[in-house]
Amino acid sequence: MPHRWDSANYARADVRCDYLDRFIANQAEKGEHFTYNDILIAAIVRMYSERIQMNRFVVGNKIYDRYDLTIAFAVKKVLKDNASETVVKVNFDGSESIFDVRDKLKAAFEDNSGSKVNNDLDLFMNKLLKLPAWLLRFFMSCVRWADRHNILAGSLVELSPFHNSCFVTFLKSIKCDFIYHHVYEFGTTGLFVAMGKEKKAAIVNEANEIIPGKVMTVGLTMDERIADGLYYANTLRYFTTLMSRPEMLLKRTEPKFTKELVNERHDRLMEENR
């Protein structure tokens, strides 16, 4: 399958809100404040850290390992229908605790909120859209060609909202249920995660009784070429466990995604396969 759109698999994770609410309340008693967004991103970071094959991408029918872990998400500058939005990319090395993730997210939201705030991507797009239509089409055709051959300039990759490990959409924040987000053929995004709003559902308590409760559903769209079915299944189970037990995210772990560490793993694998 040469394309990302015809290699897309879909899955959902139903997370009991009482687990999340209990964790948030317990941490609030200690003076630490977390949101569902913090838990979701921290769980994604830890998932990539422990399931490192997920941090790969396919270009030109070849699979590549990433040197970094980058999560992107859209930020509405003002919560109004006609307000502009931007895309923010946050870098991790896989070692982060939920405290580290929360602080990085808070800084990213604060730096990119406000109707008069423009980040580097906004400034670049403003200049790009001033080009004549024919020149813009030519520029984009060159960019797409370079992307297909994995030779796109590093400065453009750094700016691009389509070149990342994972793209997250916080639909809960606009009171919308989860979706299965479409994939982009352009770029390298291998996983889309859409967090929906809470909704009432029947749940089973510790006494094995069916009781009313709340569930939040997370929709995932994945490029199946980066790992096999068993690896994906185990990864999804691990992700669901992290979302149900956020206390697992309180401590840091070893960094996994730097150029040196990725190359070391690659060299070790090549040596083992000789």
Q: Where do the model's predicted regions map?
A:
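C-terminal catalytic/motor cores of large multi-domain enzyme assemblies
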Residues: 1-274
